[in-house]
Amino acid sequence: MAAAVHPRVVRVLPMSRSSVPALAASVFHSPPQRQLHHAVIPHGKGGRSSVSGIVATVFGATGFLGRYVVNHLGRMGSQVIVPHRCEPYDTMHLRPMGDLGQIIFMDWNGRDKDSIRRAVEHSSVVINLVGREWETQNFDFEDVFVKIPQAIAQVSKEAGVEKFIHISHLNADIKSSSKYLRSKAVGEKEVRETFPEATIIKPAEIFGREDRFLNYFANIRWFGGVPLISLGKKTVKQPVYIVDVTKGIINAIKDPDARGKTFAFVGPSRYLLFDLVQYVFAVAHRPFLPYPLPHFAYRWIGRLFEISPFEPWTTRDKVERIHTTDKILPHLPGLEDLGVEATPLELKAIEVLRRHRTYRWLSSEIEDVQPAKTIPTSGP
């Protein structure tokens, strides 16, 4: 026999007529909220999970300086747009530098203003770090340092970008023997005319873990010696640390007085190129065998590397740049004006050069090496 089915009885509590309006009022009218100043409202958990209020587009973010700039921006809670032309796998190292969804990647074409516009239309800050060590069939120095920066500055101006940061070079000069430095000088002029409120930064040679300065000289040992024009005793360098340059860029973004100014970023000490390279080999615990090489012979070697199908170790233009004395520009503000204390080369060179040591000297202390000889700031 089938079991009897007993329907469930749902009981509803009686509600008085006077309670109905009160219930409706509680549903449709939320209680008053406290008015708090934005300064006392927490913005994230701090670090990269905070909110800096900066939305920055960084052109050239996959390069040497770019990865440091993106890291600093992401670490302070900024949203960073990274336009790139490379394979997506070549940008993987940038993804962990910001919180989830804060590092945004997009393809772009330096010759297409529409793609530039898509990259900057939502940004309050645009940073141009586009650069190239040597010319290629697709992009020469005029394209990289003049036309593309001018296009980025123009589109940024039209899009209403608040701050534009352009990276040039300390030795940029229209009369330079280096096409690289001549193009940098023209690019500065074009950016200033297109975006008068832009902040232009002129760093000296930058050294860091992935640089093409200290590593360049350390790798010369594979050629059996160190070729230098006039033994490097007629060239003066004042290299600056990569982290100091990055801090200067970030502080220039925060400083409202930096708009429309040009800054010169240099290290605290000046060195003869001979003494600097000698110090590089001393830190690497490698034999230093310098020899003078005529200017025309060094350029001929550079030309051989240029026509090679592989990445050139040096070029004729790089020969000119490394033998160009760094300028002294006392009329321009520097790192100290942005609250950054320049780091001495002797404190950070080991980070770059330790990998050039043999196993025997791998853990040797930096104190075992005599500091490089310096010259006065008013030197040659």
From Swiss-Prot:
Alphabetized, the UniProt keywords read: Acetylation, Electron transport, FAD, Flavoprotein, Mitochondrion, Respiratory chain, Transit peptide, Transport
**Posttranslational modification, per the record?**
Acetylated on lysine residues. BLOC1S1 is required for acetylation.
Q: Which cofactor does it need?
A: FAD
Looking at the record's lineage, which domain of life comes first? Eukaryota
Name the principal localization, coarsely classed.
Answer: mitochondrion
The N6-acetyllysine modification is found at 189
Q: What is this protein called?
A: NADH dehydrogenase [ubiquinone] 1 alpha subcomplex subunit 9, mitochondrial
Corresponding gene? NDUFA9
